[in-house]
Regions:
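Extracytoplasmic
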Residues: 75-78, 96-101, 110-118, 129, ...
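Second-shell loop/turn segments in exported
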Residues: 89-92, 132-140, 155-160, 212, ...
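C-terminal solvent-exposed extensions
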Residues: 58, 70, 273-397, 402-410
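Flexible, polar/acidic helix-loop-strand segments at domain edges
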Residues: 74-76, 174-260, 409-410
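Entry/capping segment at the start of metal-dependent catalytic domains
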Residues: 2-111, 315
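Soluble non-cytosolic domains of exported or imported proteins
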Residues: 97-98, 128, 137-144, 163-167, ...
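Amphipathic, coiled-coil-like alpha-helical scaffolding segments used for oligomerization/assembly
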Residues: 140-204, 277
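Extracytoplasmic/secreted envelope proteins and their assembly/folding machinery
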Residues: 100, 131, 143-151, 166-170, ...
């Protein structure tokens, strides 16, 4: 009896071992399958980006041609330039007017993307050391000159850029099903006035709004909204609208299905000019979902406008470029301790001397800085007025022809 019992126990143990072996085998197969799936997905994503990459208008910029001020190096951050071209013809090189100039900083430690719009009429030193409006750099020398202008004046370390034609923005909005935005009565009135022009350039139908309210804007409406300028707040308020549209697109884009994203890529990539290599695009694509969109600002923080400077015409003048750059770095790179370079100090002094605009001694940059929630458009309406020692020295000169004319969107 004991012998039979031992035999049964032995068989039970052997059966248990066999079951365990089968389970381990299945588990190993499952693990291998899971790894294969992950690799397949990764390879698919890589293959997807590689297949689409050649659709970009790729512009290679020699790193030796990029100028970076001495001592400027950003550890833990990647900073890129984003330009919005208004050629509306798909031509995105020199000769293109850039209504939108945005510095985008990726904070790798915190996983945050911060944006700063550079007001297009800001008087800055150009790549050739002359002075003109910020958007003149791209117009006269293309993306390389624009990057160098940003690096030199703002102590940035920008190596790459992307330029998007306005038609591309219209297409993206429509392909994502529109973006929900609250529009004021004055904005609706101006939008209705110019949406036809935008729709015609995009080869789409124009739809007007019924006054102010919350709307799901279509492509032409969203682009027109982002470009409205001749309203209270002028270009300052316009940059806020641009950043809002980008934020709304980002929020919808990260929720889009792969089919929609595929269509967007096929449609949009040909309307994008960039210096990013395939390796860099793959790296950005792989990490994109892990970043959240943070705050945005307009630059310069303290400024005065209506200053006529030679051929630049009616320009926005920073009230102390050096102080504004210091505040910009506090915003874009909060973990960095920054002292502005001697180059920025020199440019800051030159702008003050050339325009006769002096920063008030009692102005505190940090206290004066406003976020989008506090309406950046009102920054220069404060009690610390700029001291203009001689505002008429260049008032008789004609305005530059590098800016578009006419229309509330210009």
């Amino acid at each position: 009896m004991a012998k039979k019992r031992n035999q049964r126990n032995l068989k039970a143990v052997q059966a248990a071992k066999a079951r365990k072996k089968r389970r381990n085998r299945r588990r190993r197969r499952a693990i291998v399958l899971a790894i294969e799936v992950i690799i397949l997905l990764a390879l698919s994503a890589t293959a997807f980006v590689m297949a689409k990459y050649d659709k970009f208008q790729r512009v290679e910029i020699n790193s030796d041609d990029i100028k970076i001020n001495s001592g400027v190096k950003k550890e833990g951050y990647t900073t890129v330039a984003l330009f919005g071209g208004d050629s509306r013809e798909g031509e995105l090189e020199a000769g293109t007017r850039t209504d939108t100039i945005i510095v985008v900083a990726l904070d790798h430690k915190e996983g945050v993307i911060r944006m700063a719009s550079i007001y297009r009429d800001t008087l800055l030193q150009q790549d050739d050391n002359t002075y003109n409006k910020a958007n003149h750099a791209y117009f006269s020398g293309g993306p390389k000159a624009a990057i160098n202008m940003l690096n030199k004046n703002l102590d940035l370390d920008i190596q790459d850029y992307a330029t998007v034609d306005f038609k591309a923005m219209s297409d993206v909005v429509d392909m994502l099903g529109g973006i929900k935005i609250q529009v004021t009565d004055p904005e609706a009135k101006m939008l209705n006035k110019y949406v036809g022009e935008t729709a015609k350039a995009s080869k789409k139908k124009a739809h007007k709004l019924n006054g102010g309210g919350v709307y799901t804007l279509d492509g032409p409406q969203a682009v027109t909204y982002a470009r409205l300028r001749k309203l209270e707040g002028g270009d300052y308020k316009r940059t806020e609208r641009q950043r809002l549209v980008i934020k709304k697109l980002y929020e919808k884009g990260i929720k889009a299905d792969i089919g929609t994203l595929n269509k967007i890529v096929d449609k949009i990539f040909p309307q994008v000019s960039t210096s990013f290599s395939l390796k860099e695009v793959l790296s950005l694509a792989a990490s994109a979902s892990s970043y959240k969109l943070g705050d945005s600002q307009g630059f310069p923080f303290e400024k005065t406008d209506g200053i006529i400077y030679r051929t630049a015409g009616d320009a926005v003048v920073p009230l102390g470029l050096a102080e504004n750059v210091e505040e910009l770095h506090k915003f874009l790179y909060p973990n960095e301790t920054k002292t502005v370079s001697s180059t920025v100090q020199m440019i800051s002094t030159e702008i003050s001397n050339l325009t006769n605009v002096v920063r008030p001694a009692n102005m505190n940059t940090e206290e004066e800085t406003n976020t989008d929630n506090n309406s950046n458009s009102n920054n220069n309406n404060n009690s610390n007025k700029p001291v203009i020692t001689n505002s008429t020295s260049d008032s008789g000169n004609s305005k530059s022809n590098n800016n578009t004319t006419g229309g509330g969107t210009e």
